[in-house]
Design a protein with these regions (language model features):
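Aromatic-anchored segments of alpha-helical transmembrane domains
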Residues: 20-27, 164-170, 212-226, 272-285, ...
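Alpha-helical transmembrane segments of multi-pass integral membrane proteins
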Residues: 246, 272-377
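Short juxtamembrane and helix-loop transition motifs at transmembrane-helix boundaries
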Residues: 116-121, 141-151, 166-177, 224-232, ...
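Interfacial loop-to-helix transition and helix-capping segments at the boundaries
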Residues: 9, 61-74, 174-188, 224-248, ...
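Membrane-interfacial entry segments at the cytosolic side of transmembrane helices
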Residues: 204-210, 261-271
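Structural signal for the C-terminal ends of transmembrane alpha-helices
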Residues: 83-93, 198-204, 223, 248-260, ...
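Membrane-cytosol interface segments of multi-pass membrane proteins
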Residues: 1-217, 347-381
């Protein structure tokens, strides 16, 4: 087991980078004339449109780039979640004596001849409740606002149950039933927690790599058939679409720089960032390369965090990212609320006025939600 490569402040800074990309993307991509992303499916016309705006840049270029690339904050969250799981459950003893008795007999030898499901079920229940605690406050607030504002979503009973049970990702046509849209992440995370505990926990690295290769292989097969298909959409809504960054986080926690090469020189890290940015853009131009972009997104974010941490005059930016990471959970669940309030301003022509008000309000509401979520008791393992 590798010692902690990413410190707690570094993890928070990475969360800050990720949530900034996500909450800005989720505003920008709802604006009509702005370039759309290839998040669940690969659309060549979106890539062609990106190339057009890059060839003839205007004042909306930052909005175009946030719309197209901002969703890659999700793979960074998956990477960090996997990293945290390994550091928490594999790097040190974490079970109490009572919990260990569920897995071991009195003699201390591991029970054999039968599968003990109690501990995995406790693990899954614990992480489901953690996700539920984070989701429920934002979901209740959003649904009330959604009902009293124009364009409210029509929920079916099954949609609500699936949202609260976090199995909405597996239902047909997830685009039409998951509302607010970013909440698909909770079902994805629950699936990955289950996969980790049942298949990858304390297993040989070959299990992780094998599952990553299988998921990537199936995605490539779907892509060669029709990268715009509903089959591709449903596939990437579920754990298979997030297995690359999640598996990468597991391997990075265990093996460190053997998996993601970072450097101890800010200059070298800077050129590493330039290389990653160039590679991310070029890989995004075709379906095969698009499949592997999350790998380089994770590497880029780690390099950026390392660079900001090492350069003294950039320490202010690092502290801002670290603070943003500390409110990232609340910002994730609350930003659909502020988006629905402020996006009409941008849609009626003043893009940056609406965006600026959205940013200010979202951060303030996220801070308030953070204080509220602290009042909800944490689940017990």
């Amino acid at each position: 087991m590798n010692s902690a490569i990413l410190s707690r402040p570094a993890c928070n800074a990475l969360r800050g980078l990720a949530i900034i990309g996500i909450f800005l993307h989720n505003y920008c991509h709802w604006l009509g004339p702005i370039v759309k992303e290839n998040e669940y499916q690969y659309f060549q016309h979106n890539v062609d449109r990106l190339n057009q705006v890059m060839a003839s840049m205007d004042l909306n270029l930052p909005v175009h780039l946030l719309s197209f690339f901002g969703h890659y904050g999700v793979p960074v969250f998956l990477f960090l979640s996997a990293y945290g799981l390994v550091m928490k459950y594999e790097a040190k003893p974490h079970l109490s004596t009572e919990q260990q008795t569920r897995m071991y007999n009195i003699s201390g030898k591991k029970l054999t001849g039968s599968i003990n499901w109690r501990e995995p079920l406790h693990f899954i229940r614990y992480h489901y409740l953690k996700l539920f605690k984070m989701m429920i406050v934002g979901f209740v607030a959003f649904t009330m606002l959604d009902l009293i504002t124009p364009g409210s979503h029509h929920y079916a009973a099954l949609d609500i149950v699936a949202m609260l049970g976090m199995f909405n990702n597996v239902l047909p046509n997830p685009d039409n039933i998951i509302w607010p849209g970013p909440y698909w992440f909770f079902g994805l995370m629950l699936q990955l927690y289950i996969i980790y505990r049942l298949l990858l926990y304390c297993r040989h690295w070959g299990w992780t790599v094998g599952l990553m290769l299988i998921c990537i292989g199936i995605q490539l097969i779907l892509g060669f058939d029709n990268p715009e298909s509903e089959a591709m959409n449903c596939y990437r809504y579920n754990f298979m679409g997030g297995m690359l960054p999640f598996g990468l986080g597991i391997l990075y926690a265990r093996y460190g720089e053997k998996i993601l090469m970072t450097f101890h020189s800010p200059i070298t890290n800077f050129f590493g960032c330039i290389f990653c940015i160039s590679l991310i853009y070029s890989l995004s131009l075709n379906m095969i390369g698009w499949t592997f972009v999350p790998f380089f997104i994770c590497l880029l974010c780690v390099l950026v965090a390392e660079m900001l941490q090492d350069i003294r005059w950039l320490s202010g930016i690092y502290k801002v990212l670290e603070w943003m990471g500390s409110i990232s959970a609340a910002l994730f669940v609350s930003h659909p609320i502020t988006r629905k309030i402020f996006i009409p301003i941008s849609r009626h022509g003043d893009i940056y006025a609406g965006l600026l008000l959205y940013i200010i309000a979202s951060i303030c509401i996220a801070w308030l939600f953070t204080q509220l979520m602290k009042k909800i008791p944490n689940p017990k393992y």
